[in-house]
Amino acid sequence: AIATVITFLILFTIFGNSLVILAVLTSRSLRAPQNLFLVSLAAADIMVATLIIPFSLANELLGYWYFRRTWCEVYLALDVLFCTSSIVHLCAISLDRYWAVSRALEYNSKRTPRRIKCIILTVWLIAAAISLPPLIYKGDQGPQPRGRPQCKLNQEAWYILSSSIGSFFAPCLIMILVYLRIYLIAKRSHRRGPGAKGGPRKGESKQPHSLDSGPSALANLPTLASSLAVAGEANGHSMPPGEKERETSEDPGTPTLPPSWPVLPNSGQGQKGGVCGASLEEEADKEEEEECGPPAVPASPATACNPPLQQPQGSQVLATLRGQVFLGRGVGAAGGQWWRRWAQLTREKRFTFVLAVVIGVFVLCWFPFFFSYSLGAICPQHCKVPHGLF
């Protein structure tokens, strides 16, 4: 029964991790640099399923080490290498999640395939540094027990403690602290909301922003309706009461134009009022007549020179002396980019939560082994661990 279950787990591990590697390498949507961690982690798990678990199963079923002594030493080193690599990979992934959430804009620009590969290489070097000492330093071999040969891990206290700390306890502590920090960041940003960071605080007066002040300037730019309202009132053409009330009720928080932006001059400044605007210069009157022309149908003064304008998507409108000027798509595109970054941050948090659950289960599965393994070095005489539990 045990052999059947373990064999099924071996096949399931190989099949599942192979699908992960194929999905990352073939799917265009999964070719993000951080997914290279998953490829390397899946490769380590496949190595465990093919090179470690079958020999461990044979050793448990037979009750002794059937294979050669040299392969026993290599087998133990590979066991520590692949298992340590899996755990340190999870630690590296948690750090990658933390940097992506806490410093999204700065870290995402640095998250290149070359940088991720360097981190993966560092992970494997750490695992190799922990697994190779038993192959290099044999230590006191002692008399070989009579009977059937056994293949056991290094029993020296210094190696047991150092390998346990480096392979499990230190990465586990790092992952717990990192995910706790990520949880606090996600909780704080959820309370604050996506736009609270750039908004004014209580007691602070709103200052006019320039057009190149980035995505935060979107909230301070006038909308199409507010710009037309300001231009109409400056020309002496006020909006109908119903329209004005509706506009005010729909957008009570729309900011007015900053003083640095030009608006149409007031008709009460000694200028003539006209259908197309007001000016003291005859040339301006001539231009206005040319621009407006004779209306084909009777129209109100407020709409004779201001026909319905189609606002380009992603643009803003600014009232000027010549009418309305559509600003470029730069600000709108910056706003869209800002929202895409916020959506990416939300996905990072969601993926972090799922990954935290997976790592939590992984840690709970590994803790009994490393705890019982460490007890053999701390108190070898009084802390006897049952062989079946180990």
From Swiss-Prot:
It is a multi-pass membrane protein. Residues 191-218, 233-311 are annotated as: Disordered. CDD domains: 7tmA_alpha2B_AR. Disulfide bonds join C72-C151. Residues 26-36, 96-117, 181-354 are cytoplasmic. SMART domains: 7TM_GPCR_Srsx. GO terms for cellular component: cell surface; plasma membrane. GO terms for molecular function: alpha2-adrenergic receptor activity; epinephrine binding. PROSITE patterns: G_PROTEIN_RECEP_F1_1, G_PROTEIN_RECEP_F1_2. Residues 280-292 have a biased composition (Acidic residues). It comes from the Eukaryota. Its main location: membrane. The chain crosses the membrane at residues 1-25, 37-62, 73-95, 118-140, 157-180, 355-378. Keywords: Cell membrane, Disulfide bond, G-protein coupled receptor, Membrane, Receptor, Transducer, Transmembrane, Transmembrane helix. Alpha-2 adrenergic receptors mediate the catecholamine-induced inhibition of adenylate cyclase through the action of G proteins. Belongs to the G-protein coupled receptor 1 family. Adrenergic receptor subfamily. ADRA2B sub-subfamily. Interacts with RAB26. Interacts with PPP1R9B. Interacts with GGA1, GGA2 and GGA3. This is Alpha-2B adrenergic receptor. The lineage of its organism: Eukaryota, Metazoa, Chordata, Craniata, Vertebrata. The gene is ADRA2B.
